[in-house]
Amino acid sequence: MREETEPSERTLGLTPTWSVATVLTIFVFVSLIVERSIHRLSNWLQKTKRKPLFAALEKMKEELMLLGFISLLLTATSSTIANICVSSSFHNDRFVPCTPSEINEELESTISTVKRTQLTRSLFLHTLRRRLSGIGEDTCSEGHEPFLSYEGMEQLHRFIFIMAVTHVTYSCLTMLLAIVKIHRWRIWEDEVHMDRNDCLTVVAREKIFRRQTTFVQYHTSAPLVKNRLLIWVICFFRQFGHSVVRSDYLTLRKGFIMNHHLTLTYDFHSYMIRSMEEEFQKIVGVSGPLWGFVVGFMLFNIKGSNLYFWLAIIPITLVLLVGAKLQHVIATLALENASITEYASGIKLRPRDELFWFKKPELLLSLIHFIQFQNAFELASFFWFWWQFGYNSCFLRNHLLVYLRLILGFSGQFLCSYSTLPLYALVTQMGTNYKAALLPQRVRETINGWGKATRRKRRHGLYGDDSTIRTETSTIASVDEYNDQVLDVSETSPVQDNELELQLIRGACGNSSSVETPILRPCASISSTTFSRLQTETTDSLSRSSSLPMRREC
């Protein structure tokens, strides 16, 4: 009887001011801590000149702002939407994940459990009574029902909150695990720079490309079809152990340096980290297609479909496919080099886009982005169902499938973060083009300024033959591909005038082992006349500037 005579909920007009002030203080305090933490992190990234990570953080802030805006809209319009009435014929049992009888049964079972355990009895009973009363509540005229109830709007609001927290957390953990894994390869890079007698280069040339002894030997004795099948099987299982070994790293490092005409002392490891940091901003945030995926999932998650279980298989399957493909790229390069007779001098590894699906290495990054989002969505859905509907609800009734979903989700996320993403950062350097991270920031800013100036001239009809931009420190030739973050260095194009190379500025003695900054040599896309003028202008620029590196005298 006491439960039936309990007063209804108090409004703010009937609530003591001290309780309102206490709750408001707590929310403001927590929000300020989060805001200042993000602000300090942004300042630290800017101070350490980690612009790619700063851009990724800005993208996360945009995602939180978008989700916060959605949350505000839901809060502001919940009463209005709940008062929109539609015919009851639209609310049939075909497009519902649970039936009213199941909801009633589950809530009554939960009430009896709470009564037996006496744990937070009043809170649970009050919430459950609201839900039970909401099931049969009719705020519309006879034959009509709310388009979406007020309780449903609140539950959707909580899902947005859980989704934001889960996705941001997964994004940070993904980057953290990937960086930890890549930093373990630093010792191999240091070994190369410590090898002053170049002995490691000789060993790498003669032995490093035969690291996969099993299928290299099989390659010379078995039919081609079996060969390919065996290679794929080995590549599939290699991603579960040491996905990258020392010989893998040194093989791909040497191929990258030879293909792009860099010196053997180039710091490939630092370049790879810079490249991964720039690509990390592409796998954070929620794009339009991913939001479409969420909407489609909400639409087709009907009773008996077990859609959550089948969707949990997608990310782990994609992780295994992407990992096997990346391992297959390494295996292909190793087999190509193993087929060369006794490693003839002058033969070099041929990194190229043809090694990847559809000749697009960046496609793998899009798949990794989807994998990360799907895993975050899977975990957020589980927490949401548990919080809003209970552990024994119709969403989580089959506990075996729930456990399988969680195991697959966590396993796929760990494998993607600690194995697949670092492997992607290494293997995608084997494409035809090198990435913009190879260029120093000063050169990239100059090229970007040239592109903006050229586009401005074209808009005003002032574009002429003189397509160079002069600064106080350098003269840079045309590079239109900068906007795509890739500079083309394909070997198939004929080099008739001058070849675009990246050389390291070394001391005149030639015995320096320090890693220097690459600079641009003359570009192959300009004519001989323009090149002569460019040389003259560069000489004048060198005489005017004192900020360019100078040769050291022995």
Curated annotation (Swiss-Prot):
GO terms for biological process: defense response. It is a multi-pass membrane protein. The keyword RNA-binding does not apply. Pfam families: Mlo. It is found in: Membrane. Residues 441-462 are annotated as: Calmodulin-binding. The C-terminus contains a calmodulin-binding domain, which binds calmodulin in a calcium-dependent fashion. May be involved in modulation of pathogen defense and leaf cell death. Activity seems to be regulated by Ca(2+)-dependent calmodulin binding and seems not to require heterotrimeric G proteins. This is MLO-like protein 14. The lineage of its organism: Eukaryota, Viridiplantae, Streptophyta, Embryophyta, Tracheophyta.
